[in-house]
Amino acid sequence: MSERDFNTQSPKFKDENANSVISQSDFLGKSLKNNNDDYSDFRGSYLNDKSSFQTPLRNGSYQPKGSLEFTPLLQSSNKNSDKYNGSLGDKGSFDPNSYGLSAISKQATQEALSISQGNDSYDVSKLTDLSKNSEIDHTDGELPANAALTLREQEKVLEKVSRENFGLRIKIVCLEKRLESMAPEQIKEAVKDNVELHAERANLQLQLKRTESLLQKSEDKNFKLEEKVDYLSKVNDVEQSQNVKVFTERIRFLENALEKVQREKDSLSTEMEEDKSNKEVDYEYEIRQLQNRLDELSEELDVAQDLLTEKEDEIATLKRQIEEKENSSSAFENEENSSYVHLQEDYAILQAKCDEFADRIQVLTADLEKEKENQIMHESEASIGLTDSMQVHTLQEQLHKANEEIEFLHDQISRMNEEGKNFEDIMLQFRSLEEERDVLESKLQTLEDDNNSLRLMTSSLGNQIESLRTQNREIDEEKNHLRLLASKNSDKALAETNIRLQEVTKELETLRMKNSNDLNEIHDLREENEGLTLKIDSITKEKDRLINELEQRIKSYEVNVSELNGTIDEYRNKLKDKEETYNEVMNAFQYKDNDLRRFHESINKLQDREKELTSNLEKKNLVISSLRETVAMLEKERESIKKYLSGNAKDLDNTNLMEILNDKISVLQRQLTDVKDELDVSEEEREEAIVAGQKLSASFELMSNEKQALELKYSSLKNELINAQNLLDRREEELSELSKKLFEERKIRSGSNDDIEKNKEINVLNSELADKLAQIRHLESDKMELDKLVHHLNRGIEEANIEENAVKKRLCLLMGCDYSSVSILQIVSQIEHFVNQQIQTIRSLKQELRHDFVQFSGKKEQELSRSFEKFGLGTETKHDILAQRNRNVSEKMNDLENAAQKFFSSPDRKNGYLYPSEHTSKIEYLEKTIEDLKLALQDELKNRNLLMDDISSYNKQTTKLQEKIKWLERERSILIDELESYRSNQFNYQNNLVQDKNELEERLKEIQKELEVYNNHFMKQAELMTSNVTDESQLMLKTLREALQSKTNNIDHLSTILERNRKEYKSLLDDYNQLRARYKNLQSNTPQSTQSGQYESEIKGLSKLTKYLQSKCRREHSLRLDLAFSKKFILMQLTGYETCNKINLRMLQKIGISPDPDLSKKHIKLKSLIIVVCSIERMKRMKNEWLKQAQLKQSLQRAAAKAKTANY
């Protein structure tokens, strides 16, 4: 895994303001300043030792100081520490030259895991909770230069990638299942033949399930909508019936009340004369009753307003449902686009398969040619001692086999052409799917237009509701006015209440009309929903049909793949052998590496042992030398004592001294013997170590040789892989070139005048290809004859170079004569006679081969003539091509025969002896001619392969052009059908517009009639009120005039709606005329810009996208592992520091030294320090972001306020 450095990205806290964060950071900074003097020394002890903070590299070394760190904790601590000489810029960027952390190895990760699992003293959630609310703000899935994601952010990104690449996962699963049952050498072919088809089938099934689920959801939604509509209609009916009943009852009640009031008025007029004192009391009572009745009327108006609000809510819900339907239709379009992309991928895969089959046929032909050459060599070596009849028989069998192989190859080519035809059918169906997609798009546009019309209707309903609200306001004002009048005159109040009741009844009638209109609109919406459901059902049926057709095609391709598996099985064994050898080489490398490590370890141990032994020897030598000196001193003393005793033998005390000295000497001698034994043992061990070292060195040399051999194998395998990759690149380049040629050919094909010339050129190229194929076959036969001659000449060269005696002995053994009685000249004459016989047999064989070849070429000429007739060539060109072919072959055969005759009919060979110098020169001449012929053969073979490729490409081009013509004809028919459907839709739309226009005119007439009635009624009321004209009556007149103005405004609004409808009708007519002109242009000008390059660009884009996604997944996986390990490593270091401090304190306590309690209390832990520093830095960074967010909120609030004021 590559080593990378990262910068932290500050998380965004949700429930905090910028001012609160600033206050927290200030508080933490002050608390740190107060304790800074106490723990500075404690922190410096750790910071001065930079090796303690460095993480180990993968190979055990340390990273240089210039690299950036990759964890949020250490980076923030380094930024706030003065010991690292780091500097933060204006944007808070860290100076990497101050200090950095290096990458981390796998062993360190395992140690960190073991330590973190064993130690529960540190809670990881305290650190990870800081990054919970971090957001991912990256573009195009790539990380910025100075950012590092947390684990949860990485998980979110991975979830997005997994959702986007669900199809890739399915392909991977299918590949793994298939690879378990296949040989490793057939992986590429299997992936391209079977696995991708299964994956695409799974994708199609998933798409089916999704579409079915969407359809079920849409059906459920439609069913719910229908239920809601039914329920609303029932509710409206019930409410209308209830409202009618309530209003009728109220009207009757009010009429009865009015009658009662009038009766009471008559009674009051009689009673006024009798009892004037009670009149005022009765008046007040009646006024109160009238006020109560007015309150009841106001309550009824409130109920009507509530009903209006409920209907507005229902209209809003219907609008939402319409928008949801639009969203569902957009989702359906996206699914259709995805299916379209998958079909394009199918097309690219099948095209790649065709190219692979063509390459495979070329490889098989090359292998067959090589096998033929090897067979010819073996048969020529074996046929030296055989008879002429056996040679003829074997040559005939070889020719028969070669013909069978050629026929087999032709059959394979025909199969490939059939597969290409199937592929063409798939392309036609694919284009039909595109056409259906366009039709669906047009249908969706019509639906959008219908939705727009519904929106306009809803807007008109909203305007009507607003007008009703204004009327309600006017009614409220009139009620207030009535209350004022009731306080002054009861008679006037009664008259006004009567008038107002009549107006209320009229308004109730208008409300009923509006309710009926709303019900009609609901009915229309229900019909539209039913139409949408029918359209969705038709679309699902079409999709099911297409899916069934695709499944049938997939089954047919599976059958073809099963037939091709027979050819694939032959190559599996080769791949298995190569992979086994590769695995053996890699295992051997591993074993050898382990043995080398062990060997180095044993050598190091032996060297250490040798050093120990040498040190022991030196020590023992020093001891021996010291002991020898002491022994010499003691012997001298002994001799001196003996001399002294010999002089004074009578002294008994001296005898005791002698015994003591003898004991000392015996002890020293024993020590000497022990030292000598130890030296002998050490020397033996040293010799054994030397022998073991020699054995190990020998084994090391063997291992190094084996390692070199394995490295050579590994390099050879690596070169083979590189060659395979180069071949793939070449194939891709050839594909791109072919695609360019196809695009050019399509452009050229679009012109009608250039078609005849291009057909002629294609015919000429086909004739040339046929000639070259015939020449190649003749050259193959010539090659076989030349191989035979080369073999004989090489044998003669070998015999000429051998010494005369060896030649004589071998010739005598071959001829069956004695070595002493026969001379060299006689043996040479016999050999020449045998060679002449062989030449005659070769000539007879050549004649037979020519006869057979003439028959075979006759058949081929017939086939060529048929091909010429297909392409429209004449007989003259055919005879010219065949004559040139025969001339070339005859010239090459004559050259070979002349060279052989010159060699065998030389004057020296006639005399019976051939000098070695002349012999070598002639042989060199023949070798040169043979090499020239070989080069010519190779050139012809290359030209043949190129011509075969050109033939296949031209055949493909012709088929594609024919398909294109068919597709254009179909497209034309589809456009005609669309025009007809559009005309029918336009006619229906015109009829609908006319009906709407008539309805609006009728409605205008009705409104005008109502206005006339209202004006008449108003005039009558004015005549009645002229007798009692007061200030209050003038106010009433003003209110009535305002009501008239509102009605006139409504009339103006309806007239504007009519004008809008007329304008829309004109715009639709203009669009219809434009479409008609466009259709005429399409008929006159055929589509020159085809979508030929589109498929290739899309295929390339998809391949690049898959590679990018694979690299992205790998990169994210590596990032996740590195981040997890870095966190665990930091935790390990922190726990290590804590444990070290605890151990040191315990040691000091055991010794008896205890630190001051003040110091221990004021010391701050490294863990808490890091957390505080991180929080301060993050809050500082978040300050600017929160300020920006606050500014944005303020600007949005201002914009909303402006919008509200503009609406009002």
Curated annotation (Swiss-Prot):
Transmembrane segments: none annotated. Pfam families: Cnn_1N, PACT_coil_coil. Residues 151-375, 387-803, 874-1091, 1177-1204 form a coiled coil. Residues 1-91 are annotated as: Disordered. One of its GO terms (molecular function) is spindle pole body anchor activity. One of its GO terms (cellular component) is mitotic spindle pole body. Signal peptide: none annotated. InterPro entries: Cnn_1N, PACT_domain. Keywords: Calmodulin-binding, Coiled coil, Cytoplasm, Cytoskeleton, Nucleus, Phosphoprotein. The modification Phosphoserine is found at residue 906. The keyword Coiled coil applies. Residues 1-17 have a biased composition (Basic and acidic residues). GO terms for biological process: mitotic spindle formation (spindle phase one). Its main location: nucleus. Interacts with ccq1. Spindle pole body component that binds calmodulin. Overexpression of pcp1 causes the formation of supernumerary SPB-like structures and disrupts both mitotic spindle assembly and chromosome segregation. This is Spindle pole body protein pcp1. It comes from Schizosaccharomyces pombe (strain 972 / ATCC 24843). The gene is pcp1.
